[in-house]
């Protein structure tokens, strides 16, 4: 098969592992920077171009689109879909998962466990917003933040009011969530592929830090999932419409709660912690599904 990988970073671990796994299985692979693509959209024959050259046909596309280029990256991916190319994760699923508030709303409708979450626009609503999530301590998140950036733990009510007011003053979109103290600075990353969790790791925050992201200095280790945790992770990925997802869970006193669904989960941490060939499993999944008939995505 001819496989395109949409990625700005050909030297990134995840991209290199996918290229390696696909090549090992006899496929032709091309890493394409979506920001270098431009599109011809017409009723006869749509196409994608780079540097004056039209891209050749591909059987499948694996999107590794960073959060900062979601809009343009999704547009390029959608063009591949409109041309009949199988997308491992489609543009609609990626857009859903990148909108933190929308993803929370969708999962709440499906009855998936979540931290109590509040969203408001007016500063006069701040006191009620804080009460809604159980008071301080609480977590304040920028809707556009990634890798733990733009996440604040407000330990007192006064601190919470000040931080929320400051973000609102900057016209930044934020959501407020209850703080799951019993998680003790740890979360669980479930790597979902299709209808299975194929790998999982526990991420522990550094001492004095509540964010467990590996980019923030957290450490990763093997973890045994409960049947409920597996079910929640798979349901969360399906709710977003994703074939591949990194679902982040916290173990709370009222069961597993989903913090985030990542449509472009990194492979380095999960492969290192579990010693599993996650990249190989992804390529095998693409092989099994790319040749099936696939209608163009809905806009």
From Swiss-Prot:
Binds 2 magnesium or manganese ions per subunit. One of its GO terms (cellular component) is cytoplasm. Mg(2+) 1 binds at residues 248, 260. Its EC number is 6.3.2.-. It holds the Pfam family RimK. ATP binds at residues 141, 178-179, 187, 211-213. Mg(2+) 2 binds at residues 260, 262. GO terms for molecular function: ATP binding; metal ion binding; ribosomal S6-glutamic acid ligase activity. Keywords: ATP-binding, Ligase, Magnesium, Manganese, Metal-binding, Nucleotide-binding, Protein biosynthesis. It comes from the Bacteria. GO terms for biological process: protein modification process; SOS response; translation. Its cofactor is Mg(2+); Mn(2+). Mn(2+) 1 binds at residues 248, 260. The keyword Protein biosynthesis applies. Transmembrane segments: none annotated. Residues 104-287 form the ATP-grasp domain. Mn(2+) 2 binds at residues 260, 262. Belongs to the RimK family. NCBIfam families: PRK10446.1, rimK_fam. PANTHER family: RIBOSOMAL PROTEIN BS6--L-GLUTAMATE LIGASE, RIBOSOMAL PROTEIN S6 MODIFICATION PROTEIN. This is Probable alpha-L-glutamate ligase 2.
């Amino acid at each position: 098969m001819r496989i395109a990988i949409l990625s700005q970073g050909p030297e990134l671990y995840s991209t290199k592992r996918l290229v390696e796994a696909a090549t090992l299985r006899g496929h032709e692979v091309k890493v394409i920077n979506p920001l270098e693509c431009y599109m011809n959209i017409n009723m006869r024959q749509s196409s994608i171009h780079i540097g004056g050259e039209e891209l050749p046909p591909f059987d499948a596309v694996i999107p590794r689109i960073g959060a900062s280029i979601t809009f343009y990256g999704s547009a390029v991916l959608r063009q591949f879909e409109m041309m009949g190319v199988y997308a491992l994760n489609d543009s609609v699923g990626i857009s859903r998962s990148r909108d933190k508030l929308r993803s929370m709303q969708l999962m709440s409708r499906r009855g998936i466990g979540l931290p109590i979450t509040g969203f408001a626009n007016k500063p006069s609503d701040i006191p009620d917003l804080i009460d809604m999530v159980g008071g301080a301590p609480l977590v304040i998140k920028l809707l556009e933040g990634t890798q733990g950036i733009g996440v604040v733990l407000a330990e007192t009510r006064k601190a919470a009011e000040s931080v929320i007011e400051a973000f609102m003053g900057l016209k930044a979109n934020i959501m407020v969530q209850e703080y799951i103290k019993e998680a003790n600075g740890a979360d669980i990353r479930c790597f979902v592929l299709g209808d299975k969790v194929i790998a999982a790791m526990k991420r522990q925050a550094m001492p004095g830090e509540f964010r467990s992201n590996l980019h923030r200095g957290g450490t990763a280790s093997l973890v045994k999932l409960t049947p409920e945790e597996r079910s929640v992770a798979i349901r969360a990925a399906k709710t977003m419409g994703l074939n591949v997802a990194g679902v982040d869970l916290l173990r709370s006193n009222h069961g597993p709660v989903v913090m985030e669904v990542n449509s472009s989960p990194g492979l380095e941490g999960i492969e290192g912690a579990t010693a599993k060939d996650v990249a190989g499993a992804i390529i095998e999944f693409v092989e099994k599904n790319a040749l099936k008939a696939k209608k163009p995505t809905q806009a």
